Amino acid sequence: MEDNRKRNMERRRETSRHAARDRRSKESDIFDDLKMCVPIVEEGTVTHLDRIALLRVAATICRLRKTAGNVLENNLDNEITNEVWTEDTIAECLDGFVMIVDSDSSILYVTESVAMYLGLTQTDLTGRALRDFLHPSDYDEFDKQSKMLHKPRGEDTDTTGINMVLRMKTVISPRGRCLNLKSALYKSVSFLVHSKVSTGGHVSFMQGITIPAGQGTTNANASAMTKYTESPMGAFTTRHTCDMRITFVSDKFNYILKSELKTLMGTSFYELVHPADMMIVSKSMKELFAKGHIRTPYYRLIAANDTLAWIQTEATTITHTTKGQKGQYVICVHYVLGIQGAEESLVVCTDSMPAGMQVDIKKEVDDTRDYIGRQPEIVECVDFTPLIEPEDPFDTVIEPVVGGEEPVKQADMGARKNSYDDVLQWLFRDQPSSPPPARYRSADRFRTTEPSNFGSALASPDFMDSSSRTSRPKTSYGRRAQSQGSRTTGSSSTSASATLPHSANYSPLAEGISQCGLNSPPSIKSGQVVYGDARSMGRSCDPSDSSRRFSALSPSDTLNVSSTRGINPVIGSNDVFSTMPFADSIAIAERIDSSPTLTSGEPILCDDLQWEEPDLSCLAPFVDTYDMMQMDEGLPPELQALYDLPDFTPAVPQAPAARPVHIDRSPPAKRMHQSGPSDLDFMYTQHYQPFQQDETYWQGQQQQNEQQPSSYSPFPMLS
């Protein structure tokens, strides 16, 4: 008996196991069939699906067909087979995601793209309550706003909907880490909510727009928007304080609103908003400071020429800490839909033109009238022209004395100033309507009248070529002359009827150089020059005569200073080393009463005045850093040796300091005796011991000059 009972129990257990196995197999087949019927569980975002979630999704699909059946299009038999308008392509082009929520806040449907923005899949949201994924304070606002949209059947519903910002849970951190649903973060999502009446109640259609998940923090995304939204796609960036005063405006803002004539810095952003859209913008700004991020509905900004710009703004609040104090500002990215006239924006909405928008998108303001008749203008952006030109010791001009009166300083208002005194005089003048200094470099602005030679006048005080600085090409300065060979020209006498025009700018440097008596080298025979500028030499000096020479003035003549007033100095265009007569310095010293040694009543014998030759080694051609060229093997030995010196740095040339030989060393018969001691005599008495044998020295000096070779080198330190 006992054995039969055990045998029956084993048979029953085996039968029960087979029944349970068969039951589980049938349940699995049923769930497999149900899974095949539910469309959303076959998406790629579904990683794991339990049977409870499958039943929840299946029940939600059945509820969706019942509740939203009359508000959704069910007849898909006549669907156009064009792949461009399929459901998949439209969902991919959609910005954000779409949810369908029942009146009891149950999520009936959500698009697959929700996983990109919140990290939650369709199966995680479908069939569950929206309350579980919203911030508690935001759900109360959503419930209140959705009830305002619910209207009885037969009444006209609001086709535009309402905009609100709701904070939803996200399971992806800003750095891309996956989180648990219990430790999820809240993220601001801008929703556009529509409500429709269904058989089972009201159904809400919600479109959510936000930043994709795992793309960084809100501050980082706002900074990225500031940098990368300056594109020609109709978007521009502004930055505001907490009271919406503009602190930064992009260039696109001036292009769209045509506000380049009026600065917008410091003005309120509300001044640009159309009065009819002020309530929309103010409500969006309140939500911005409460939730940190918004996307406004479409509104209008007042533009120039009686036009309106349709704008949609995405704003973000940025919190920063500066010097221990927390601050906050707003970054707005404005997307421009188009520009239309003020009267056109008041047109009643129709089916062909929804929301009162213009038909022609991105219509620009016609600004052709602003550019008719204007010629192209080339603006120098690299070469900056200073306000005053650098003082060149080679281009000095002495103002002529006309009619025994002092010349009047009349600087050309359109010319560039040659000294800081002229600049200060121009800045503090009593004529505010006078034109400012010239903007571009032009030789015509500095040229007055072509200088003419005066045969019987005094010699030119210029040390180098006395032609106008602007008459020489700028590009040849500081570069080696390309032409080789002798550059000698004969002396020429000019007519005495020509007059020199007034110099517009009086140079104190020229006065100082003329007083110092900067002389011409007495040992020049040929015009061979190894300087950078290809300028011809002046008169050739006889090596046998080392005396001081004057152009157009014989050595045996005497010059009375009192009779030189009113005579114009000659500025020869071919003089390179033109002499600087002592008479010019006397005339200037008499005019300004600054000559310490000479008086105006003495005649001067100037054929045998001895002057010490200045050191011309400092007059090597100046080479700018940008004009440096590779030295070739064809350079003269002097230049090649000069550029081979170690630590050679080009520098701006300076005028050599000419020093006259002490007056006691000149021949006794031709000394200029003063009536009393002067400052110059005192200086040479303290620092210079004259030779005692003056007669013997001058006799030997004359013989030595006759025997010395007639070659001259501008670099005495290398010769």
Swiss-Prot record:
Residues 465-474 have a biased composition (Polar residues). Induction: By heat acclimation, hypoxia and addition of 50 ppm hydrogen sulfide. By low iron levels. This is Hypoxia-inducible factor 1. A transcription factor which is a key regulator in various cellular processes; including environment stress resistance (oxygen levels, hydrogen sulfide and cyanide levels and heat), negative regulation of cell apoptosis in ASJ neurons by inhibition of cep-1 via transcriptional activation of tyr-2, resistance/susceptibility to pathogenic bacteria, lifespan and brood size. Involved in mediating susceptibility to enteropathogenic E.coli. Increased levels of hif-1 activity confer resistance to P.aeruginosa-mediated death but also confer susceptibility to S.aureus infection. Expressed in all somatic cells. The keyword Endoplasmic reticulum does not apply. Disruption phenotype: Displays developmental defect, exhibiting slower larval growth. Exhibits intolerance to hypoxia in nhr-49 mutant background, with less than 2% animal surviving to L4 larval stage. 66% do not survive embryogenesis when cultured in hypoxic conditions of 1% oxygen. Able to survive anoxic conditions. Inefficient translocation of aha-1 to the nucleus. Inability to acclimate to heat. Partial resistance to paralysis and killing by enteropathogenic E.coli and P.aeruginosa. Extends lifespan in a temperature dependent manner but not when grown with a restricted diet. It is found in: Nucleus. Keywords: Apoptosis, DNA-binding, Hydroxylation, Nucleus, Repeat, Repressor, Stress response, Transcription, Transcription regulation, Two-component regulatory system. It comes from Caenorhabditis elegans.
